């Protein structure tokens, strides 16, 4: 249902359980227009893909705060459309898991200068990067508790044959009570083999923009081979090490520098691993006599205050060879987490593998636009049904 509002801002499918608002709340400076039953608390920031502010329902006590992310100019940029569609589909698919951020509402506003896709999500006070890099003292129990939650969320994601592809502390939100929630599914990808076979397609190579460099697995830096869930496991290993270092452990300025930052700690990879990567870049890494040969530095030397179990888990996650890394089920069962683990509260996604075959049909801007509008309509229809 399209609603013409008093400020001539048109919105698609305003939540029916709240009623169609007769006016809009305007934040002119940031070109934000939201339904009149919200009031804006504050502007939170602006990034590459949108503007974020916090809002609350008018006249409600206690006032639950909501984060609103506006993605501007979305219908004119293919990359924004693709990211938005992916994120909406994945967040809807994974809704309900306590360690994955919850999408509350969606709205498409078409009236300039407020036009864009508006995503309403639960507002969470911090991201994990702020926690790790703060002066707050973290005990090993805290680290176990945080890591366990990350792995619970990742287990749910991986059980649907989905790779997040951009796990990092900045994409893990943290409530005041210490509850972690994985967010930002704009780069996530379904990898179930059956769907590739159905459409006679092959698994694509990972794109250059996927995975923030500091958390990027070696195979993403050196190989053109299809990637697997192990790229997320590498990122988890980087995050675990970062808990102890209180800063990222591999901080490369570019892709090649990133490789050498990893080499300085893990040592120069064996030739069979370099051959397995299957690229000239990887082969030259071992062939070039100007490159110094590094020996592996024991993680226990880097983090002498960490427990034996923590060191063992870091070593088991950060392997040059992706096939030697633990999978998420093995990681969550590691003795390091015995103190905090609740095996009966580690659900998997019962909807089965995520079907990503829709992507092959979205081969034009017009199809992408129409698909996004349809996704928003479907979300709001489901939202209205669930509120009855």
From Swiss-Prot:
Regulation of its activity: Activated by tyrosine and threonine phosphorylation.
Residue ranges annotated for the Protein kinase domain, each copy included: 38-337
InterPro entries for this protein: Kinase-like_dom_sf, MAP_kinase, Prot_kinase_dom, Protein_kinase_ATP_BS, Ser/Thr_kinase_AS
Annotated catalytic residues: 166
Cofactor: Mg(2+)
An example Gene Ontology biological process: ascospore wall assembly
Assembly with partners or alone: Interacts with GSC2.
Listed name of the protein: Sporulation-specific mitogen-activated protein kinase SMK1
Organism: Saccharomyces cerevisiae (strain ATCC 204508 / S288c) (Baker's yeast)
Gene label: SMK1
